[in-house]
Design a protein with these regions (language model features):
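Acidic/polar, glycine-enriched structural segments that form the non-catalytic walls/loops
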Residues: 1-62, 161-178, 182-185
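Aromatic-rich carbohydrate-recognition surfaces in CAZymes
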Residues: 63, 68, 72-83, 87-188
Length: 188
């Protein structure tokens, strides 16, 4: 009985997710790929990032900036809350000059977790600008992917005022989402 209940709950969960957007093409295989498997992969990637990948795990932990932005832009219709959470984490992982930290753990920017002693090869979670990698070590396109992710989120949710929200930078200070996006474009 518990197994049947759990199975039915799981089925209902995915029915709800997949029911938010349905694409119809003349090819049933394409329909299944787009409406089921692509959405499933996107949801799983956004929920657990790519931590499960042996390629990504190799001694590193955290969110890959580009991967996370690309994953987030695929789910605002099916999981707007998680999409916004990832976008806000990426905004926190942006340096005021406009480049993203290529790999970072969102927990670094949570006050209660700043003093856990973890030493990252990418960034040390302190507000000292000289402790964060400089633009010469930045991947120029990482943060650019956040722009369409925010656009897709706003188009889907209608939360236009999201661009006015103040969000901290990784290297200290804060600015609105709009100013973060402008910094990204100016850097690139």
């Amino acid at each position: 009985d518990n197994v049947d209940g759990a199975f039915n709950a799981l089925h209902s969960y995915w029915e709800d997710k997949c029911g938010k957007l349905q694409i119809r093409t003349p090819n049933q295989g394409m329909n299944t790929l787009i409406n089921t498997w692509t959405l499933y992969q996107s949801e799983i990637n956004v929920m657990v990032s790519r931590f499960a990948s042996f390629i990504e795990v190799g001694g590193r932990t955290g969110l890959g900036y580009r991967d996370t932005a690309q994953d987030a832009m695929t789910i605002p219709h099916s999981n707007p809350g998680k999409c916004r959470e990832r976008i806000e984490q990426l905004l926190n992982g942006l340096v005021s000059e406009g480049y993203g930290l290529h790999l970072f753990d969102p927990a670094w920017f949570e006050e209660e977790k700043k003093s856990d002693g973890f030493k990252s090869p990418t960034v040390i979670p302190v507000a000292e600008k000289d402790r964060i990698h400089g633009p010469e070590d930045a991947c120029a396109d990482d943060a650019l992917w956040l722009v369409p992710a925010v656009v897709e989120y706003i188009k889907e949710t209608g939360e236009i005022d999201f661009v006015e929200k103040a969000v901290p930078y990784a290297d200290g200070g804060s600015a609105t989402v709009y100013e973060h996006l402008k910094a990204i474009l100016d850097f690139s």
